[in-house]
């Protein structure tokens, strides 16, 4: 194993249009095959659409959507004496943001709209209203943690 320790965390470059690190993270999650300009046009198009449909600041809409998707608790597999338990653990804030963005983009990709911009826009709007597949994923995660609460003492 390497003895140098963990790699230092690189600072996130702030988005040039909205001055928000969240938008930068969203662009990086959309990114495929290194085509950053394509990812940026998808995200900016979706945020412009959010501005048109809500009449408000699109970054606020995105933050509201993320707050509705962020999990507070999740389950991790833990092997104890030959059987595997799903142990509920709290989610760190950075991980919850990352998971929320990952779920938002993942379920936007599965939607049926014609362009990725429309899919992302509608998933963000649904999530900000407490609807959509990403919010359902969070509810399922919380339900799973709640049903396995008996194993919470196996935490590490």
From Swiss-Prot:
The keyword RNA-binding applies. One of its GO terms (molecular function) is structural constituent of ribosome. One of its GO terms (biological process) is translation. Pfam families: Ribosomal_S7 (PF00177). GO terms for cellular component: small ribosomal subunit. Keywords: Ribonucleoprotein, Ribosomal protein, RNA-binding, rRNA-binding, tRNA-binding. Part of the 30S ribosomal subunit. Contacts proteins S9 and S11. Belongs to the universal ribosomal protein uS7 family. One of the primary rRNA binding proteins, it binds directly to 16S rRNA where it nucleates assembly of the head domain of the 30S subunit. Is located at the subunit interface close to the decoding center, probably blocks exit of the E-site tRNA. NCBIfam families: rpsG_bact. This is Small ribosomal subunit protein uS7.
């Amino acid at each position: 194993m390497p003895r140098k320790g963990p790699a230092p965390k690189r600072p996130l470059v702030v988005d040039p249009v909205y001055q928000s690190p969240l938008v930068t993270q969203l662009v990086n999650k959309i990114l495929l095959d290194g085509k950053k300009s394509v990812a940026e046009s998808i995200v900016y198009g979706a945020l412009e659409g959010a501005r048109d449909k809500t009449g408000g600041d699109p970054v606020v809409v995105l933050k509201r959507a993320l707050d509705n998707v962020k999990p507070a608790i999740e389950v991790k597999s833990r092997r104890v004496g030959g059987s595997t338990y799903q142990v509920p653990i709290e989610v760190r804030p950075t991980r919850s943001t990352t998971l929320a963005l990952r779920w938002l983009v993942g379920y936007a990709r599965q939607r049926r709209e014609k362009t990725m911009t429309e899919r992302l826009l509608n998933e963000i709007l649904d999530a900000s209203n407490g609807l959509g597949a990403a919010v359902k994923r969070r509810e399922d995660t919380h339900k799973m943690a709640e049903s396995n609460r008996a194993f919470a003492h196996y935490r590490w």
